């Protein structure tokens, strides 16, 4: 499976955005060290925004392009449709539900088969959830203290389009998120403009 490689904190500083969720990721960021601090052309600004979004969700270029095509072919506004596609990925929803402390960790957990989706084992991070789908931490995986602590510590801090059943280690994708509810600082219209050329 292809992975996004390279120093993660350095990537965050280069993009001018904490895309890994670690509190120290931007600690050494000085003025002038990120692309966001430099004067860019319109194309450069659009490209940077695309790279930020792709890095945030940990998606490779080819897959990201497929998502963009799907968004443009949908009946919704392309930028919001793209965010909805990315947000509904299993690895992201595992993170949003509080099973993992980062999308990167969530992807590893999914790869290792720690979850059931609607009662069936799914180990594909890019698997797309539908509204109403249930994600459950497998019984044997509940013996891992880190997984249990992640989930219990996140109770009350989940996004509004997710509900959780603490006793059952279950998360439910309850509804389509509103744009303002998705906790990511991205100007998706710039990405739409980038791919509209």
UniProtKB/Swiss-Prot annotation:
CDD domains (alphabetical): S4
One GO CC annotation: small ribosomal subunit
Domain S4 RNA-binding stretches: 88-150
A single BP term in Gene Ontology: translation
Superkingdom, taxonomy of origin: Bacteria
Keyword annotations from UniProtKB, A to Z: Ribonucleoprotein, Ribosomal protein, RNA-binding, rRNA-binding
Annotated Pfam families: Ribosomal_S4, S4
InterPro entries per UniProt: Ribosomal_uS4, Ribosomal_uS4_bac-type, Ribosomal_uS4_CS, Ribosomal_uS4_N, S4_RNA-bd, S4_RNA-bd_sf
PANTHER family noted in UniProt: 30S 40S RIBOSOMAL PROTEIN (PTHR11831), SMALL RIBOSOMAL SUBUNIT PROTEIN US4M (PTHR11831:SF4)
Subunit structure: Part of the 30S ribosomal subunit. Contacts protein S5. The interaction surface between S4 and S5 is involved in control of translational fidelity.
Biological role stated in the UniProt entry: One of the primary rRNA binding proteins, it binds directly to 16S rRNA where it nucleates assembly of the body of the 30S subunit. With S5 and S12 plays an important role in translational accuracy.
Protein name, entry field: Small ribosomal subunit protein uS4B
Organism: Clostridium perfringens (strain ATCC 13124 / DSM 756 / JCM 1290 / NCIMB 6125 / NCTC 8237 / Type A)
């Amino acid at each position: 499976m292809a992975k996004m490689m390279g120093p993660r904190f350095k990537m965050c500083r280069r993009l001018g955005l904490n895309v890994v969720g670690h509190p120290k990721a931007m600690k050494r960021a000085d003025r002038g060290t990120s692309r966001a601090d430099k004067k860019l052309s319109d194309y450069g600004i659009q490209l940077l925004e695309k790279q930020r979004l792709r890095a945030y969700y940990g998606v490779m270029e080819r897959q990201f392009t497929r998502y963009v095509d799907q968004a443009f072919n949908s009946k919704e506004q392309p930028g919001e449709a793209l965010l909805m596609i990315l947000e509904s990925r299993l690895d992201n929803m595992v993170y949003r539900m509080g099973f993992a402390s980062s999308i990167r960790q969530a992807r590893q957990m999914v790869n290792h088969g720690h979850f059931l989706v609607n009662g069936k084992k799914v180990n594909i991070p890019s698997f797309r959830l539908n509204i109403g789908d249930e994600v459950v931490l497998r019984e044997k995986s509940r013996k891992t203290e880190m997984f249990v602590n992640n989930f219990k510590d996140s109770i009350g801090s989940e996004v509004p389009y997710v509900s959780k059943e603490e006793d059952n280690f279950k998360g439910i994708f309850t509804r389509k998120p509103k744009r303002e509810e998705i906790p990511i600082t991205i100007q998706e219209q710039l990405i739409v403009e980038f791919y509209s050329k």
